[in-house]
Each structure stands twice: as structure tokens, then as C-alpha cells.
Design a protein with these regions (language model features):
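Glycine-rich phosphate-binding loops of nucleotide-dependent enzymes
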Residues: 2-237
Length: 237
């Protein structure tokens, strides 16, 4: 069985006096795709932000058996965790290529340019737009850039927050196909927050259902996607 790469235990997260996550616990195993599902307001984005050191938390977050609960966001990136936020989060005034270079801020090796070329090979449209500002790209192109920029840090774990949000179905399909390739061919472990339950579970190994800041269901993705009661009750089916 694969090793546990990321583990959250009794994790709470708050914005000021408002507690959003109420002691949740979950695991992500090495080389798997795990998804967190739930309706708007369930706490999905807060979960990803908590793992990235962006909100106040209690409980324990371990990555490769090391406690990262109190680390700042940039230190978490240096440990091997990259975050693609909801809404793309590119630097709109920078060019496509400069955005990619920003993604490699923790690196000092000689492979950065090769990795930029790999991003262009994965998404040829980014090569075509490499001298344009990120703000001039379409929504789908910005999402491709956001994912590529995160990969420039060579993460072991990629956190993706609502990657399908606001995108045309054909763009979403292409993105998720690329996620599968990244996982199967390159061994990138992923934790994906999604509202599109059928799409996410269709590519995942493991799923968690979040409701009102608590994990109410967890299990193999295949079992969740085939459980009509779960789909109806929690996933909008």
C-alpha cells in the first residue's frame, strides 16, 4: 500500500471568530488523486487554504511525516506542496513566461527553462501566448497557466481549488485529461476540491464529502460515484 503523503488530524480553520472547519481528519496517499466534494459553503476552499498555510488553524497537518501546521505559505511550497487557487490567481500584468518563472521562485537549478518548455509542450497555446500578459488570456488559458505555474516548483503534492469553475465543458475535459497524465505518467499526487462530483470522482482514487465544515462521508471514489443515495443527498445528483 502507498505511503501517506499528507495527513490532517482534527483540523479546524477560522476566519477571526468564525470557525469554518470543525475538527476534520483525512489522508492523501502518495501518487493518488483525492477529491473533496461538497456544496457551496461546505468549507472546501478553506480546507485547501488551511493546507497551504493561508488561514488560522488548530490541529495537525503533516506532509511526508513532518508537521507543517505552523509554516508560512512560502515554506510549505518549499516543502513540496503547490496550490492552484480558485479563480486562477495568475499575475495579470506579467507575461505568460514571466508567470511561469515566478512559479519557480524556490529553485536555483538549471532546469527551469526545460520545465517552461515542458509546460509549453503540454499546453501549446501558452507558447503561442508566451509574450502576452496573463490578463489578456481567456479563462481556460489562465487556468492552464495557473496549473503550469504551480508545477514549476516541481511539487510532490498539487492542491487544486475548483479547477473547472467558470470554464466551458470542452476546456474542463482537456484540463482533467492533463491531470490524469500528470498523475499516471509523472507521479504527481493531487488533492482536488470540486463541485462537479461526477467529473472529479471519475478520475479520482479517493473521495471525501464535506458538509458544513465536517467530513460526512469518505471512501473509494468508485464506491461513492456508484452510490445513488450519496449522489442525491450530498452531490447534487
Amino acid at each position: 500500500m502507498a505511503d501517506v503523503l499528507l495527513k490532517a488530524e482534527n483540523l479546524t480553520a477560522s476566519y477571526g471568530q468564525i470557525e469554518v472547519l470543525h475538527g476534520i481528519s483525512f489522508e492523501v496517499f502518495d501518487n493518488e488523486i483525492a477529491v473533496i466534494l461538497g456544496a457551496n459553503g461546505a468549507g472546501k476552499t478553506t480546507t485547501i487554504r488551511a493546507l497551504s498555510g493561508m488561514v488560522e488553524t488548530t490541529g495537525t497537518i503533516t506532509f511526508k511525516k513532518e508537521d507543517i501546521s505552523q509554516l508560512e505559505s512560502d515554506a510549505i511550497v518549499r516543502k513540496g506542496v503547490a496550490h492552484v487557487p480558485q479563480g486562477r490567481g495568475t499575475f495579470p500584468e506579467l507575461t505568460v513566461e514571466d508567470n511561469l518563472r515566478v512559479g519557480a521562485f524556490i529553485r536555483s537549478d538549471n532546469e527551469v527553462q526545460n520545465d517552461i518548455q515542458n509546460c509549453y509542450d503540454s499546453y501549446p497555446v501558452l507558447f503561442e501566448r508566451r509574450t502576452q500578459t496573463a490578463g489578456s488570456l481567456s479563462g481556460g488559458e489562465q487556468q492552464m497557466l495557473a496549473v503550469s505555474r504551480a508545477l514549476m516548483s516541481r511539487p510532490e503534492l498539487l492542491l487544486l481549488d475548483e479547477p473547472s469553475l467558470g470554464l466551458a465543458p470542452q476546456i474542463v475535459e482537456a484540463l482533467f485529461e492533463r491531470f490524469l497524465i500528470m498523475n499516471k505518467d509523472h507521479g504527481t499526487t493531487m488533492l482536488i476540491v470540486e463541485q462537479n462530483a461526477q467529473l472529479a470522482l471519475g478520475m479520482a482514487d479517493r473521495g471525501y464529502v464535506l458538509e458544513a465544515g465536517e467530513i460526512v462521508i469518505e471512501g473509494a471514489a468508485e464506491s461513492l460515484i456508484n452510490d445513488e443515495a450519496i449522489i442525491r443527498a450530498y452531490l447534487g445528483g
